[in-house]
């Protein structure tokens, strides 16, 4: 089943992206480099739960 997740910026800006992930195929937490418009750089985004 695909679940909604939140990707939170590691730069500490509070910026986040939302996406879906298949928990069966990727049970570990995702870490992706994406663009953070607050600091205007590509930074690591880590998976967090949507509350």
Swiss-Prot record:
The answer on whether this UniProt entry bears the keyword Ribonucleoprotein reads: yes
Q: Which GO terms describe its biological process?
A: translation
One Pfam family here: Ribosomal_L33
Print the keywords alphabetically. Answer: Ribonucleoprotein, Ribosomal protein
Q: Which GO terms describe its molecular function?
A: structural constituent of ribosome
CC per GO annotation: cytosolic large ribosomal subunit
Q: Does the keyword Ribonucleoprotein apply?
A: yes
Entry coiled-coil feature ranges = none
Protein family according to the UniProt entry: Belongs to the bacterial ribosomal protein bL33 family.
- In Swiss-Prot or TrEMBL terms, this protein is called Large ribosomal subunit protein bL33
State the organism of origin: Marinobacter nauticus (strain ATCC 700491 / DSM 11845 / VT8) (Marinobacter aquaeolei)
Q: Where is the organism placed in the taxonomic lineage, from the top?
A: Bacteria, Pseudomonadati, Pseudomonadota, Gammaproteobacteria, Pseudomonadales
